[in-house]
Amino acid sequence: MGKDTIADIITSIRNADMNRKGTIQIGSTNITENIVKILLREGFIDNVRKHRERNKYFLVLTLRHRRNRKGPHRTILNLRRISRPGLRIYSNYQQIPRILGGMGIVILSTSRGIMTDREARLEGIGGEILCSIW
């Protein structure tokens, strides 16, 4: 049985967000770095640091929380893995789903790298739908 690194990232971010943790540490691979760059660019996380420990690289993510009188609120409302190792889901650029009418984002793996649904529509390419965030 293989290891699903994308599902691991999504689960650890979702769990840390639900428990209002400030930082989390995930293993660093090319796919995880590209997904984290998209999350940083879209404003779902505040900061990313690369950390080395015993010849292994980790990414330390600082999650973004809104403050109010009761304490920190969640920023990431929902993260969902769409394509998984047992059931891959592909889409061309015309049929990429819109999440909440464009309020959320879909992360795709294309022939030109990992990108959001907006970037894929602008470039006119489709790919594997990895996850959705809203």
From Swiss-Prot:
Q: According to its record, what are the GO cellular component terms? A: chloroplast; ribonucleoprotein complex; ribosome
Q: Name one GO molecular function term.
A: structural constituent of ribosome
Superkingdom of origin organism: Eukaryota
* Quaternary structure annotation from Swiss-Prot or TrEMBL: Part of the 30S ribosomal subunit.
Function field: One of the primary rRNA binding proteins, it binds directly to 16S rRNA central domain where it helps coordinate assembly of the platform of the 30S subunit.
Q: Name one GO biological process term.
A: translation
Chief subcellular location: plastid
Q: Which organism is it from?
A: Gossypium hirsutum
The subcellular location is: Plastid, Chloroplast
Tell me the keywords, alphabetical order: Chloroplast, Plastid, Ribonucleoprotein, Ribosomal protein, RNA-binding, rRNA-binding
The similarity annotation says:
Belongs to the universal ribosomal protein uS8 family.
Give the HAMAP family listed for this entry: Ribosomal_uS8_B
Query: What name is this protein filed under?
Result: Small ribosomal subunit protein uS8c
Keyword RNA-binding tagged = yes
